[in-house]
């Protein structure tokens, strides 16, 4: 796990060997300890260089070991011993020096970085803090303000920025290890006291209290309710104390964080994202037995908000794109907006815009040679079928045909083509060039090659891609329905939009359900409800106003839309805004009047509703639908659902996702509360506990990592 060599006659070269990122596993720590002891005790050795195998210095702790007892030497005393050694130690940093890897570099007396290396302390993103002296040494090296920013955000920095900040001593484009070896020889005999960061006094600028107060306010605003960033501020503050006191405080804060549910949720989220990449189809096809095609050219049909974002996402990763619109004016508007988006994106990233990859057309005939087509017109099945028929006629037989539908039947689109096996859904989230999530929808006839290609393309575009089954709404939007429904029922019963939103935002959502709806546009859901026969001229005349299709229905959202209140775009929605397009939501007395009139009309006596009830009804209904989705094989594993909600719907990452949250609350508790609310509202099917939830509780409420076994067992008995 660490190779030892004597080079240049007097330099001990220690190479970490734990692929892929040379993580500091127990075996690696043990090897570092033994090789450092050997180097420091060998009179022939005058200096030490530490590097990593395969162009990577060290990616930090092996977080797979977090769940078990500590094995191998603890990191803090190991690093302290390296720093205290009497021979100069040089870190040769290539690839990454992150987390514990950067803390290892900090105890080296000198740091040489390759110009492509990236450095940082990202522990805060896992719900913890740098606990091997990182919060104590970095402020001593670069000062409190810069250290606070890096540690509380977990941001990685380039080698050039690291040099500017003082995190490294030299940046090289040459062989980093060779440069470090020469540097080490020149350092022999030089005093090391000023290079031992723990021995230095942290520079304290004027107004130190104000700096920490501002940092506290900033992390509270940006990471509402999240423990780790606040603990990082407190740990950096402890760097103003003697090292022995500061490192003790760092350890105390780490112990508190490590045992918290938030750390468990954030670490689960980290692994869930990787688990979702390992997709499996009901047919048995999966990520490791399906070869994707290489996509060099693509087409996007429709240059609305979504289509423009998809074009940008494709072009900025080097794919030639033909963008198609039905009218010249729409095409020209779309062209100008796409070019502007690409130019701004290129300027931000410091690269040239990929405008030469773009072609704009009014004719589907131009798509005859592309590798893949993504249809992104509005949600009209008849229109989409018409387009897919034409694509089937125009495109070469091997072209993949994908739809960006947010919930329509992908198999119905496959029906009208000559290649149903090459039809799949690629559900982007708006704005598509910003949002990370991509639902790849597998129809019953979608081939493993088609799904593998869509998943691979998503990854190439920087998306977090999740393979899901075909049903109305797929995973994300299907689950959203009971969540939204419960929010409107709570309005009926006495809550206000701002009360519900505040409860959800205090839970950790960036936006509550009604602010989110105003942003998305209330007319979108209204159109879907009309098409579903829930409102408008197609409603069954026998249905009472508050019942549809044999179940409870809340017409309040329809009443809001009937007044022309479509959200931010019209300056009025669930909230009022100073002008159309404004984002500053204010409570609207007209909405309160509408609610009071509605309750009076239907004889509803408003009652006091607690934040706990809001959270339970909205989130337990959300998770309950997730259990149904797992039972129906629309999602293959709970991690898929959680990743979709973390990256597509703003579920707070420190809560892990709706399924992980249910497991942390306790499945018995979730079942008991759903039964309670379903008893109170028996005509709301979404509150009836899922058979899978009941089965898991009957089997002792296993941890979420074990659900897959029980789901397979349940499927085998169906």
Swiss-Prot record:
Keywords: Fatty acid metabolism, Isomerase, Lipid metabolism, Lyase, Multifunctional enzyme, NAD, Oxidoreductase, Peroxisome, Phosphoprotein. One of its GO terms (biological process) is fatty acid beta-oxidation. Residues 281-567 are annotated as: 3-hydroxyacyl-CoA dehydrogenase. Pathway: Lipid metabolism; fatty acid beta-oxidation. It comes from the Eukaryota. Coiled coil: none annotated. Residues 2-280 are annotated as: Enoyl-CoA hydratase / isomerase. GO terms for cellular component: peroxisome. Substrate binds at residue 100. GO terms for molecular function: 3-hydroxyacyl-CoA dehydrogenase activity; delta(3)-delta(2)-enoyl-CoA isomerase activity; enoyl-CoA hydratase activity; intramolecular oxidoreductase activity, transposing C=C bonds; long-chain-3-hydroxyacyl-CoA dehydrogenase activity; NAD+ binding. Its EC number is 4.2.1.17, 5.3.3.8, 1.1.1.35. It catalyses: a (3S)-3-hydroxyacyl-CoA = a (2E)-enoyl-CoA + H2O; a 4-saturated-(3S)-3-hydroxyacyl-CoA = a (3E)-enoyl-CoA + H2O; a (3Z)-enoyl-CoA = a 4-saturated (2E)-enoyl-CoA; a (3E)-enoyl-CoA = a 4-saturated (2E)-enoyl-CoA. The keyword NAD applies. It is found in: Peroxisome. The record marks 123 as: Important for catalytic activity. A motif (Microbody targeting signal) lies at residues 716-718. In the N-terminal section; belongs to the enoyl-CoA hydratase/isomerase family. PANTHER family: 3-HYDROXYACYL-COA DEHYROGENASE, PEROXISOMAL BIFUNCTIONAL ENZYME. Peroxisomal trifunctional enzyme possessing 2-enoyl-CoA hydratase, 3-hydroxyacyl-CoA dehydrogenase, and delta 3, delta 2-enoyl-CoA isomerase activities. Catalyzes two of the four reactions of the long straight chain fatty acids peroxisomal beta-oxidation pathway. Can also use branched-chain fatty acids such as 2-methyl-2E-butenoyl-CoA as a substrate, which is hydrated into (2S,3S)-3-hydroxy-2-methylbutanoyl-CoA. Optimal isomerase for 2,5 double bonds into 3,5 form isomerization in a range of enoyl-CoA species. This is Peroxisomal bifunctional enzyme. It comes from Danio rerio (Zebrafish).
